Amino acid sequence: MLETILIAVVGTTIGIVVHSLNANVAHRQPFLTDKADFYFDEMYSRYAAKKNPKDFTAEDESIIWEYASNHIAMFLTWVIDNGFYGNIHYEASDDIQLVKARKMTGTEFLAKHCDYRLSDEDFSPEILPFVECYYFQKYIQQYDKLFSKKAMALLHPPPFSWEDYDLIAKRITRAYKLWKFCGSGK
């Protein structure tokens, strides 16, 4: 009942997402690794549609990795911004501060400290239950919906930008707050 009222008040897809997450907490699954390797071949093909692979440079390959990891980098940036990173990243405190100050992108941090991948150890115990409910089930859908028109025009995901990050960060924050409010984040 509370979830239904909340959805009516919020009136957004996010409200429905959180209702779905709250209703399916029992279906929470351990966070599986998400890594740019999963998307590299597709991004390579899309990039090759614009430039002959025979002419690819190291910079081109770096750009392809950025495209393949953008959704991961955006989420990791939100995790860092909100202090929800795992103990594994405490040694990277200088770079964490650079990300928070927007002097290092999430993609740069992901490449330097995570080998272009996320796993459960990248998250604090406090946020991991939310990530397990939200990341693969809803975040990816929200990311795709938000950036699909831009991606279609470019033939690939947009590269990391702080403007795009701000758009998706609002949605992640809203989903997290509603998730906590609905009692899933006890």
What are these regions (language model features)?
Residues 1-9:
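Feature marks short, highly hydrophobic, charge-poor N-terminal signal-anchor/signal peptide-like helices
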Residues 99-167, 171:
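Amphipathic protein-protein interaction modules
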